[in-house]
A protein has these predicted regions:
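Helix-coil boundary and interhelical linker segments in multi-pass alpha-helical membrane proteins
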Residues: 1-6, 65-81, 112-119, 151-162
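Hydrophobic alpha-helical transmembrane segments
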Residues: 4-9, 53-54, 79-84, 120-124, ...
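Cytosolic, membrane-interface loops and tails of multi-pass inner-membrane proteins
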Residues: 20-53, 175-191
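Short, non-helical or kinked segments that cap or interrupt transmembrane helices
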Residues: 29-38, 96-108, 135-142
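Transmembrane alpha-helix interface/packing and boundary motifs in multi-pass membrane proteins
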Residues: 11-15, 24, 87-97, 129-134
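Multi-pass membrane catalytic core of lipid/isoprenoid biosynthesis enzymes
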Residues: 46-71, 82, 96
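Interfacial segments of multi-pass membrane proteins
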Residues: 45-48, 71-75, 89, 104-133, ...
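N-terminal signal-anchor transmembrane alpha helix
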Residues: 2-26
Length: 191
C-alpha cells in the first residue's frame, strides 16, 4: 500500500463529521447553528443531549484510532502520515466545505493509538486544568503543549515533530477561544 492511499483513507475516516451526523439524526438540528457552531464533541455537549455529546466524543476518538492502529500494525513507516491525515480530516472535512472541529478528540485518538502514556498524561493534565480553571479550550491547549514538551525532552524527537504540528493546528483552531480568554469572555464549562 502506498503513502498516498494511506493518507487519503486516513483523511476520509477522520473527516466523518459525527457531531454533525448525530445532531441531525437524533436532535433534528444542525450543530453548526448551536453554541460555537463547531462540529466537535464539546459543542455536541452544548446541544443539551449528553448522549449525543459523549457519543460524538467516542466516535471522534475512534475515527483516529482505527486508521492509526491499522497502519501501526501493517505499515509502520507511514504511521505519522496516517496520524496527521486522520487529524486533518477532522479539522478540515471535505464533506462540510473544510470547516470541521477543533481537533482535540481526534488528537486524543491519535495519541492513544501511538502511546497510551501520552494519552494518560493528556487526560490527567486536561482534567486537572479543567477543574482548576473551568475552560475546556485552555485545558486542551495547555495539555497539548505538555504532551509536545514531554515528548521533546523525554521521548523520540521524530514523534515530537508530529506533536508540534498538532500543537500549531490546535492553537489555530482555538484562535477565537484564545481571544475570548484574553477578553475574559470565554464560556466556562460545568462539571
Amino acid at each position: 500500500m502506498d503513502i498516498f492511499f494511506i493518507g487519503i483513507i486516513s483523511y476520509l475516516m477522520g473527516s466523518i463529521p459525527f457531531g454533525f451526523i448525530l445532531t441531525k439524526i437524533f436532535l433534528k438540528k444542525d450543530i453548526r447553528e448551536i453554541g460555537s457552531g463547531n462540529i466537535g464533541a464539546t459543542n455536541a455537549l452544548r446541544t443539551g443531549n449528553k448522549s449525543v455529546g459523549y457519543t460524538t466524543l467516542i466516535l471522534d476518538i475512534l475515527k483516529a484510532i482505527v486508521p492509526v492502529i491499522y497502519v501501526k500494525i501493517f505499515y509502520q513507516d507511514f504511521l505519522y502520515v496516517a496520524s496527521l491525515c486522520a487529524f486533518l480530516g477532522h479539522v478540515f472535512p471535505v464533506w462540510l466545505k473544510f470547516k470541521g472541529g477543533k481537533g482535540v478528540a481526534t488528537y486524543l485518538g491519535v495519541i492513544l493509538a501511538l502511546s497510551y502514556k501520552f494519552f494518560l498524561i493528556f487526560g490527567v493534565s486536561w482534567l486537572f486544568l479543567t477543574f482548576l480553571f473551568r475552560f475546556a479550550s485552555l485545558s486542551s491547549i495547555i495539555s497539548t503543549l505538555i504532551i509536545f514538551l514531554y515528548s521533546y525532552f523525554f521521548e523520540n524527537n521524530n514523534f515530537s515533530l508530529i506533536l508540534f504540528i498538532f500543537l500549531i493546528i490546535i492553537l489555530y483552531t482555538h484562535r477565537e477561544n484564545i481571544v475570548r480568554l484574553k477578553n475574559s469572555s470565554e464560556n466556562k464549562i460545568k462539571l
